[in-house]
């Protein structure tokens, strides 16, 4: 299926591919939502204001909120709410860490400024030197860390060995326990264990986009073991598309993370039930509001789903959305509040190239304002 051309630069909205006014598009979107069995507010690639508006719209329609990177976000969140975790900030890790344990791959893709903002120690007063060891538990022996040319000690096992198995063996050796046969060389395993145990302040870094739930759980257990004799913490890299910011906004507005539904009149969280892919594939959701103001490509939803796209004007779809409203990019076209991986919290971002483009919040508020009128219309 060929990609449909994005709407023209001069068009702010369209209905079934035909240019429309913003009011017409908002009214058409409201009609689709009011007739939906279970609206799905998905993507959620937005700033904090856009996220709040999306949650409000889900509450107004009895819909479901779901971020495009929910699976990875929840893999990092689950250990926190089940057993508790040790966490640090990028700034503290950069200043204090004398041992940095990198785990798995995809790290510089998850945080392009990883080298600059974490792995490179900050400038210190003359005569003050803090030695830092960077060790990498790599997925394979020939792995390389993109955009990093500093000293790094790579530890990798043979082909076909899972990272979870390596972590289990490493955790056992840190505790001084015997292990059975492993593809991880014993000498290398014990060397890595001694490096971690010898840390004065260590930090484990990974991205949940590349690790499974068991591997993340194992990492937190390893860090707990290390804290019996030294200081060690974790720095999970945040998901793209303001994933950590959306997670925070969902928490303070609903008490739950994403994958939360409002059909019962109050927020209900269910990671399986409210998985966007499952909802669309099963037909439980027949109308999707796809929100993406940060450049992420849309999924190829099946044609039976009514799609309301709130995205950048250049976004391309496999099939033209029923309703499309163009919005600007947060921090570029308009001021925004978003999660910053550099500081590990929400920050205000001034628009770098202010324009008259709508924000996600403004677009969703227009739709929400039309919902009462849509519900009052005769069938």
Model region roles, listed by residue range:
Residues 1-30:
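An N-terminal, well-structured beta->alpha segment
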Residues 27, 31, 52-59, 220, ...:
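A broad, structural surface signal
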Residues 19-22, 28, 35-53, 105-109, ...:
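Gly/Ser/Thr-rich loops at beta-strand to alpha-helix junctions
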Residues 40-95, 227-265:
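Anionic-ligand anchoring segments at beta-strand to alpha-helix junctions in alpha/beta enzyme folds, i.e.
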Residues 30-33, 91:
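Short secondary-structure boundary/capping segments within folded domains
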Residues 12-14, 71-75, 109:
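N-terminal start-of-chain detector that recognizes signal peptides
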Residues 77-231, 257-379:
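Non-catalytic alpha/beta scaffold blocks inside enzyme catalytic domains
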Residues 34-38, 61, 303-304:
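Short glycine/proline-enriched coil/turn segments at helix->beta-strand junctions
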